[in-house]
From Swiss-Prot:
Protein's name according to its UniProt entry: SPbeta prophage-derived uncharacterized protein YomZ
Highest rank taxon of the organism: Bacteria
Organism phylogeny: Bacteria, Bacillati, Bacillota, Bacilli, Bacillales
């Protein structure tokens, strides 16, 4: 069975992101991994299960699956970052005079789309191996 440590290490090694965005508490890391598994299962029509008591998932993940799951973690962090930025600053753009709000928001949207495209590329590469 693949451990949470393996999943988290793969994420940290492959998905550059600021420490500010990455959970530091064990419980928050578990929640992030479980959320990524929900997205993984939905996209791949899989049934991967997480067990916090053993800090493992219910099977040994292939390298492809491990990489895809790590990129789902990054995708979720980026999506949450974009949503937080939007909800925090959009109401105040005129009052505070944030001139580059649109540029920053577009940059975050592009990062989310790029990450989504990367996940699709990884899924396609894994599928090609099975053909």
């Amino acid at each position: 069975m693949t451990s949470y440590d393996q999943i988290w290490e793969t994420f940290l090694n492959n998905c550059e992101t600021s420490d500010f965005d990455v959970p530091q508490q064990e419980e928050d890391i578990y929640k992030s991994i479980r959320n990524a598994i929900l997205h993984f299962n939905n996209r791949l029509r899989d049934n991967l299960k997480a067990d916090n008591s053993t800090e493992t998932v219910n099977r040994e993940l292939s390298e492809d699956d491990l990489l895809i799951l790590a990129h789902f973690l990054r995708y979720i962090f980026l999506l949450n970052k974009k949503t937080l930025f939007e909800n925090t600053w959009q109401p105040f753009t005129n009052d505070v005079g944030i001139k580059n709000f649109g540029t920053q928001l577009n940059s975050l949207k592009q990062s989310v789309m790029d990450q989504k495209d990367e996940i699709e590329r990884l899924i396609l590469n894994a599928a090609v191996d099975y053909l």
